[in-house]
Amino acid sequence: MPPKGNKQAIADRRSQKQQKLQEQWDEEEESWDDSQAEEVSDEEEMESWESLDEELEDKPPKDEEEEIIASAAAPSSKEPARSQPPTGKVGPSPPRPGLLKASRRWDTVSIAGSPPAPVAPTKRSEKTTRPRKEKTSAIATRQDTPVAQELRKRIFPTLYAIFQQSRGQQLELKVKNRSLRSLTRSCLYHRREDQLQRTLEDAEALFNKYCSVSLKD
């Protein structure tokens, strides 16, 4: 068995260790409390700043306050307006002679001591001054003989019949290198009887040619 002195020493050491542990625990608790207090103070400071911002937002700016005061001091719009004498509409007064700008075109400005230059006519004035020429076609002005008129009366139905026969044809037929278009021009613009007679003969030949082609198909 160990002596009583050793037991006492061991007990003292244990008590010292427990005391040190207790002191460490106390220090940690104090530091923890301090940190908690700092956090609380930070939160309170943030809340104070937020409340200050809200107060500033709720408070109108100085300019708005001045506008509110001015609108309150101004007379109400419901008050009847003062009667004003009716004023008639006055048109714009004509410009004074001295204020008119002088033309500075080269063809209107005159040198001192020389007569003013004549104004050059514009295209619009030329168009208005020119006499209009009557548009007359060759058909309206010509004077056909009775024989020429009779030939034309026979050519036109033949040309119309050729047109009806050529509607379903893919190729354009010709007689003596004359097509339906050239025969129509000859009938409209030729005045001599022999020319119209040849046109009638060619038109009848072309009509017979179209008829023969359509019968073959």
UniProtKB/Swiss-Prot annotation:
Biased composition (Low complexity): 69-78
Region (Disordered): 1-142
InterPro entries (UniProt xref): Adeno_L4-33K/L4-22K (IPR021304)
Compositional bias segments (type: Acidic residues): 24-68
UniProt keyword Phosphoprotein present: yes
Regions of compositional bias (Basic and acidic residues) in chain numbering: 123-136
Principal subcellular localisation of the protein: host cell
Keywords, alphabetical: Host nucleus, Host-virus interaction, Late protein, mRNA processing, Phosphoprotein, Viral capsid assembly, Viral genome packaging, Viral release from host cell
Region (Necessary for nuclear subcellular location): 160-187
Localization: Host nucleus
PTM text: Phosphorylated in vitro by human PKA and PRKDC. PRKDC inhibits, whereas PKA activates the splicing factor.
Stated family: Belongs to the adenoviridae splicing factor family.
Further comment: All late proteins expressed from the major late promoter are produced by alternative splicing and alternative polyadenylation of the same gene giving rise to non-overlapping ORFs. Expression of packaging protein 2 and splicing factor is controlled by a L4 promoter distinct from the major late promoter.
Function: Promotes alternative splicing of late transcripts by promoting splicing at weak 3' splice sites. Required for the temporal activation of major late pre-mRNA splicing at late times of infection. Induces the splicing and expression of the late capsid vertex protein.
Subunit composition and interactions: Homooligomer. Interacts with DBP; this interaction occurs at a unique vertex during genome packaging. Interacts with IVa2; this interaction occurs at a unique vertex during genome packaging and seems to potentiate IVa2 and 33K oligomerization.
Domains: entry comment: The tiny Arg-Ser repeat region (RS repeat) is necessary for the splicing enhancer function.
UniProt-recorded name of the protein: Protein 33K
Species of origin: Human adenovirus F serotype 41 (HAdV-41)
